[in-house]
Design a protein with these regions (language model features):
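Bacterial Sec-dependent N-terminal signal peptides
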Residues: 1-21
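N-terminal accessory beta-strand-rich subdomains and adjacent acidic, glycine-rich linkers
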Residues: 21-308, 685
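An acidic-aromatic substrate-binding cleft motif
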Residues: 273-366, 374, 378
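Catalytic domains of carbohydrate-active enzymes, especially glycoside hydrolases
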Residues: 362-384, 449-455
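Aromatic- and carboxylate-enriched substrate-binding clefts and catalytic-loop regions
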Residues: 382-569, 573
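Catalytic cores of secreted or luminal carbohydrate-active enzymes
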Residues: 575-622, 710-712
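Carbohydrate-binding surface patches
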Residues: 624-666, 709-712
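C-terminal beta-strand-rich structural cap/linker in extracellular carbohydrate-active enzymes
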Residues: 690-727
Length: 728
């Protein structure tokens, strides 16, 4: 909800001079725009007078098309000009200033300021008279720009062959990156110089169930960069609607990135009808890494909430029948008796169960009991529905119906049992990437959820996309993801999409999108493990676009203790797993481990039970990509605070509690790595201490590599609470 009025100044001028300059409201950033001698739009970006993006070209390359006319006979005019990147002239410019404050339904802050200066450049191509606008918005912490195509007779339709947006770097920066891929983002991050990307990619990439690379120098956004003189730069996009996701392809000779849009099955990057626009391209810049994490540019470049009523959207903390399957203890499937499943024909009541099915009524009730005993909101159940026996690897269209439970999953009994305990069930819709099939059953699937009062669904898109040849992040498939979110809103259902395109801030417009995976999540700790600094990179990259359903909370790091046949290791300390609930903010948070593992460490589990999901304030206290992150957040509607620190390397954290209310004493419970903690050899070594703090207190704590700490802070309401506690 917006609660401050727009403060706008609009200046219209017929542009006689080609060169234009735009400053951020605080004058720290400067954008320069001009046309080259060939009429190619060009921009550059400066931070405190220092060049961040060298002169970079803008434009679109089209597929050649034929103009077809029907008359006495069909005629074709061939060779339509494919260039939308040169021979332009400026016909008009418009400057605007906006300063507003709006309230998200949920998020890291209760109030978000949207303050920018805007330059709109209207262009016309001299030979074709086609029109294209470039809209630049300069915030105090970065730049957003996009292409806009007014409705016009000269170009009512067009097909994009490639977007030619450039980001020309000033030097061989340090980068935190994952390989460019049309089908997966589930990679460990690399840290290297830009010039080293090619060699690292050529050594091979981690295998995944669906992956399609396109270049040895291709990378995905959000891309995190750091210059040798300490400037932090983040490249991403915002408001990805009706378009393919943007990758970046590096010319490692010139150090120029060019946008590389995910194509469809025919190689097209976008089918457009005017009026149309691209997503925003974003450049966040600061000499302080904390500002990258605190930036609201991605959200501010998205449209306001499109839902008239959001009262049904609530953050959820949940447990689930999931880690048992991920670790290999249980299975999603019900039987080994069928070589293949025919949805609607296979009679499961005649088949022998293999005895390893996880989603049984009896097992689910145990999780419901655990959730109720510990104050959780919901229980996720995967593998409840028929079809898992041959769900993957067969390019199968009719793979699930999203309605029919296995014989040992009594959906009505579970509904009634959960309701009696005050627990909401979370639905699971694995699509096996058969998108047409999911849309075929979507209404009935959502109606089933309404019938049994499921408020949220976890959807999955594992494997190669059907229609065959499509990519996970192409225009058509991205439109499907948004269709599913909009359709879910019609049924008052919240969506947590896994394997979908990485977020670009659309949760502002559709706040029922409460979670995404779209990166290498916690499950990979049971698939061989992730790098110990992975969670210190994700907030600088994947989380720039929106929250992640990372599934933290693993307490048993030795996966073989759960399943003797799985020798994976969770590369984190127990204190690190607690901290993730704060450092990787999300309105949807899972306690992913088994109930029995939490019962072994009830004192540490207390933090997971208490930590909030929705915030009124967030203060980033310390940050360096891949090395450490420390953040303090205030729980919305309370006076309580939570602090989290994750460390990718040995790190001594030094924080000041100046964010606390003045003249107020807080009881701080500190969950930290023990002195002998080690993420490989002694991950469950932690300490818990209680102290009294005020806004004048300071704290120094050591976190080991792969470790961290978590703190809960509650105002002192009774002097008895302070008995025996030291002041910090």
């Amino acid at each position: 909800m917006r609660f401050l009025t727009f403060i706008t100044i609009t200046i219209l001028s017929c542009a006689t001079a080609v060169a234009q300059e735009l400053f951020s409201p605080n004058k720290v950033l400067k954008l320069s725009f001009s046309l080259s001698a060939e009429g190619t739009p060009t921009y550059s970006l400066f931070y405190k007078g220092k060049e961040v993006v060298k002169p970079s070209r803008l434009g679109i390359e089209l597929f050649s098309s034929n103009e077809v006319k029907f008359g006495a006979e069909i005629t074709k005019k061939e060779g339509v000009n494919t260039s939308l990147y040169h021979n332009f002239e400026v016909v008009n410019t418009q400057n605007t200033t906006v300063d507003e404050t709006w309230q998200p339904v949920w998020g890291e802050s209760q109030n978000i300021r949207n303050h920018y200066n805007e330059l709109l450049v209207s262009l016309k191509q001299k030979d074709t008279h086609r029109e294209m606008n470039l809209r630049f918005r300069l915030f105090d912490d970065g730049l957003g720009f996009r292409y806009e195509f007014p409705e016009q007779k000269q170009m009512p339709y067009f097909v994009i062959k490639e977007e030619r947006t450039e980001f020309a770097m000033t030097a061989d920066h340090q980068a935190w990156w994952i390989p460019g891929d049309y089908d997966t983002q589930e990679y460990d991050y690399q840290q290297s110089r830009l010039s080293e990307i090619r060699a690292i990619n050529q050594k091979g990439r981690q295998a995944n169930l669906a992956q399609t690379g396109f270049s040895d120098t291709g990378v995905q956004t959000a891309l995190m960069l750091k210059t040798d003189d300490g400037l932090y730069i983040n490249l991403h996009e915002a408001a990805l609607v009706n378009y393919g996701a943007m990758h970046l392809n590096l010319n490692d000779k010139t150090l120029v990135f060019q946008s590389w849009i995910t194509p469809d099955a025919n190689g097209a990057k976008g089918y457009m009808q005017t009026p149309a626009q691209t997503p925003w391209r974003t450049v966040i810049v600061s000499n302080d890494a904390r500002d990258i994490l605190a930036s609201d540019i991605t959200l501010n470049l998205n449209e306001p909430c499109a839902l008239a009523d959001t009262s049904w959207i609530h953050p959820m903390k949940y447990v689930g029948v999931w880690w048992e399957m991920i670790t290999g203890m249980k299975e999603w499937s019900y039987t080994y008796d069928v070589p293949s499943v025919h949805i609607g024909k296979t009679d499961y009541t005649t088949l022998k169960p293999h005895g390893k099915h996880g989603a049984t009524t009896e097992n689910v009730k145990k999780y419901i009991d655990f959730a109720a005993e510990n104050g959780f909101d919901g229980v996720l159940v995967e593998g409840w529905n028929i079809g898992w026996e041959d769900w993957f690897g067969h390019s199968k269209d009719l793979v699930f119906d999203f309605q029919t439970p296995y014989p040992d999953f009594d959906i009505e009994a579970i509904h009634q049992y959960a309701k009696s305990k005050g627990i909401k069930m979370i639905m699971h819709h694995e699509t096996s990437s058969s998108i047409r099939n999911y849309e075929r059953f979507m209404d009935k699937a959502y109606q089933l959820m309404n019938k049994y009062e499921y408020p949220a669904v976890k959807s999955g898109y594992v494997g190669n996309i059907i229609p065959r040849g499509e990519n996970h992040y192409s225009q058509w498939v991205n439109n499907h993801y948004l269709y599913a979110i909009k359709k879910a809103a019609d049924y008052r259902i919240m969506v947590n999409a896994h394997e979908a395109v990485r977020p670009t801030g659309l949760c502002r417009t559709y706040p029922n999108l409460i979670g995404n995976e779209s990166a290498r999540g916690g499950e990979y700790q049971a698939f061989g493990g992730s790098k110990p600094n992975h969670v210190c990179v994700l907030p600088f990259t994947r989380l720039i676009g929106g929250p992640m359903d990372y599934t933290p909370g693993v307490f048993e790091m030795d996966i073989s203790k759960n399943n003797p046949n799985n020798h994976s290791h969770c590369n984190a300390t127990l204190a690190n797993q607690l901290a993730l609930y704060v450092t990787m903010s999300s309105p949807l948070q899972m306690a992913s481990d088994l109930p029995e593992n939490y019962r072994r460490f009830p004192d540490a589990f207390q933090f997971i039970k208490e930590v909030a999901l929705d915030w009124s304030e967030s203060h980033y206290l310390e940050a360096e990509p891949g090395a450490y992150i420390t953040v303090a957040r205030k729980a919305k509607g309370t006076r309580n605070w939570f602090v989290g620190n994750t460390a990718g390397k040995d790190f001594t954290s030094k924080i000041h509690f100046s964010f606390l209310e003045p003249k107020t004493t807080y009881v701080a419970t500190i969950y930290a790595d023990a002195k002998d903690a080690n993420y490989q050899t002694n991950p469950q070594a932690y300490t818990i201490q209680k102290v009294l703090v005020t806004n004048k207190s300071k704290l120094t704590l050591h976190s080991v590599a792969g470790g961290g700490y978590a703190i809960s802070l509650y105002p002192l309401t009774d002097k008895a609470q302070a008995k025996g506690l030291k002041k910090q």
